[in-house]
Amino acid sequence: MGSKHRVDTKDKKRTRKNAEFGREKRNSGNQELSNEPEKDTIMEGDEAEEDEQNSSSDESSKIIDNEQSDAEEDDDEEEEDDDFPRKKKSKNSKHDDGSTGFSAAVNAILSSHLKAYDRKDPIMARNKKVLKQSESEKLEYKAKKALLAEKKKLLGKARKTDIIPIASGEDRSENIRKVLEKETALRKIAQKGAVKLFNAILATQVKTEKEVSENLSEIKNKEEKKELITEVSKEKFLDLVKAAAGSDNE
């Protein structure tokens, strides 16, 4: 009996231990389950912090990129400004007036060898095209001048240059007076003739317009109308000229 009681007590202890172990496992499992959402929340918080850090880093990188682009644009503008032509610094000093270079060039020209046919005109010996062009222009000018002189001679053959005589040592005052009176009379006649001519033209224009409006209004063909108008105007004009000449003779 004593041994059985010992075995039972041992079994009871074992069952108690197993039960306690099972309870501990359950409690630990529940604790793990309760800790998992806490871990998830912690992970989410860490991820949010990482996102904020990444966004802040992206913003800072954008700002840096913008600053770099602005700096590059400024550099490009400076380079463009540098592209403008600047005055080259002269190698000569302030006190050098270029006389040495000029003297060297003149000496080189004077010491150059010229051929016999170039010695007449040594200045343009190296550029003969200009010489030929200038010679052709001179010849053209001379030819034009000669043609104008011949034209003047032909026109001056039929002209009387000494219409009014010039008083000389002899007594020619009466002849000069007669010539001047004749010239004044001829001028008056020419003036009267010009006035009568213009008056006749105006009179024919007025009369033809009246006749056209009265008699030729029925004609619709423009060409026939023009021919009749020209015939009428010619006849009227000649009649008026004849009448003016007859009145002068009377």
UniProtKB/Swiss-Prot annotation:
Modified residues (Phosphoserine): 69
Subcellular location: Nucleus, Nucleolus
Lineage: Eukaryota, Fungi, Dikarya, Ascomycota, Saccharomycotina
Alphabetized InterPro entries for the sequence: Rrp15
Protein name per the record: Ribosomal RNA-processing protein 15
Function: Constituent of pre-60S ribosomal particles. Required for large subunit rRNA maturation, in particular processing of the 27S pre-rRNA at the A3 and B1 sites to yield 5.8S and 25S rRNA.
Biased composition (Acidic residues): 43-53, 67-83
Gene Ontology biological process terms in this record: maturation of 5.8S rRNA; maturation of 5.8S rRNA from tricistronic rRNA transcript (SSU-rRNA, 5.8S rRNA, LSU-rRNA); maturation of LSU-rRNA; maturation of LSU-rRNA from tricistronic rRNA transcript (SSU-rRNA, 5.8S rRNA, LSU-rRNA)
Composition bias type Basic and acidic residues, residue spans: 1-27
